Regions:
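A conserved helix-loop-strand patch within extracytoplasmic ligand-binding domains
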Residues: 96-170
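A bilobed periplasmic-binding-protein/Venus flytrap-type ligand-binding module shared by bacterial periplasmic
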Residues: 120-129, 242-259, 276-280
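Bacterial N-terminal signal peptides that target proteins for export
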Residues: 1-10
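Ligand-binding pocket segment of bilobal, Venus flytrap-like solute-binding proteins
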Residues: 171-237
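N-terminal signal peptide c-region/cleavage motif recognized by signal peptidases
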Residues: 19-21
Length: 332
């Protein structure tokens, strides 16, 4: 793939991707986070074919992509998504908290707390790794520039922030040391894009920064297409990023497509759906598929949000609420 076609495909920030026939008699809108575009370009046609064979019905799957937290707020404010697929549970929780669009116990409706896949935060560096970036400590050196999405608008950014904080805690440090470390890290961040794909554009197209912090599936996609320009660095430890999905009941009922929406989310847990996820470097939750693709995913120490921060609710309140620790750190 040449550079022009890559920038038109991988790095294009379009708001909607349409999959299926324009004359479909049923349609779904899946509101998702920024770096699942390529996955859904393959997943959606697979589901469309599956549904056609099962029911004889032709369906259209519409996609909306952006920073996870920003997308979730759009749905809670009235964007009529039938499905929401995010990279953190809080961005689905707010659909209950703010608008009662889903039940409070939405995570109990599907396996693995409604997360068909997971990922982790890794580093993408320029070819040859000229700044010799090997682990988290290297990111706070004064001559290193780091690109991270905005933790206020992006789940990707939240995970990068929490992964850095957790790295210090896992080494035996305390919260004061972790805050100092993360403060130094964000002093090295020249720009905060609203989502993960925007951060990719900043790093890969605008050539800003020595390292990009983003999800494993995103760095492998970039490496696959532009392998002669970048290297992937796996830190010694990182965070487990879960990718939950849910039917947005209120809107699906309104659109009279609840059964279709439920089948769509369940297809993420099917062997076919899990295969597509693994091929896009999303870690499968179904054991048989995970074992098949075991060699594709680096075995590194991963900690969950609950392990270090107690829960997502606590992490959100302490770190990302207005005036909380991230705001204090970034204003310094």
């Amino acid at each position: 793939m040449n550079k022009k076609s890559l920038l038109a495909g991988l790095l294009t920030i379009s708001s909607l991707i349409f999959t299926g026939s324009a004359f479909a008699n049923s349609a779904l809108l899946n509101v998702s986070y920024d770096v699942t575009r390529e996955f859904y370009k393959d997943f959606n046609p697979s589901f469309v074919n599956y549904w056609k064979q099962k029911t004889g019905e032709t369906v259209t799957i519409n996609q909306s992509h952006g920073g996870s937290s920003k997308q979730a707020r759009s749905v809670s404010d009235g964007l009529e998504a039938d499905i929401i697929s995010m990279n953190q549970a809080p961005d689905i929780d707010i659909l209950y908290d703010r608008a009662k669009l889903i039940p409070k116990d939405w995570q109990k409706r599907l396996p693995n707390a409604s997360s068909p896949t997971n990922s982790t935060t890794v580093f993408l560096v320029r070819k040859g790794n000229p700044k010799n970036i090997k682990d988290w400590d290297d990111l706070i050196k004064p001559d290193v520039s780091v690109v991270i999405p905005n933790p206020k608008t992006s789940g990707n950014g939240k995970y990068s922030y929490l992964a850095a904080w957790g790295y210090v805690i896992k080494k035996g440090g305390d919260d004061a040391q972790a805050k100092d470390f993360v403060t130094k890290l964000f002093k090295n961040v020249p720009v905060l894009d609203t989502g993960g794909r925007g951060a990719t554009t900043t790093f890969a197209q605008r050539e800003i920064g020595d390292a990009l912090l983003t999800f494993e599936n995103e760095v492998n996609l970039i490496k696959k297409e532009l392998g002669d320009k970048f290297d992937v660095v796996y830190p010694s430890t990182s965070i487990l990023a879960e990718n939950p999905i849910a039917v947005v009941d209120k809107f699906a009922i309104k659109h009279k497509n609840q059964a279709l929406a439920q089948a769509y989310v369940e297809y993420h847990f099917s062997e076919a759906g899990q295969e597509i996820a693994a091929q896009h470097y999303l870690r499968p939750s179904v054991a048989s598929v995970a074992n098949k693709y075991k060699a594709r995913f680096r075995n590194i120490e991963l900690f969950s949000v609950g392990d270090v921060f107690g829960s997502w609710t606590k992490a959100q309140k302490v770190h990302f609420a207005d005036g909380a620790l991230f705001d204090q750190i970034y204003q310094k």
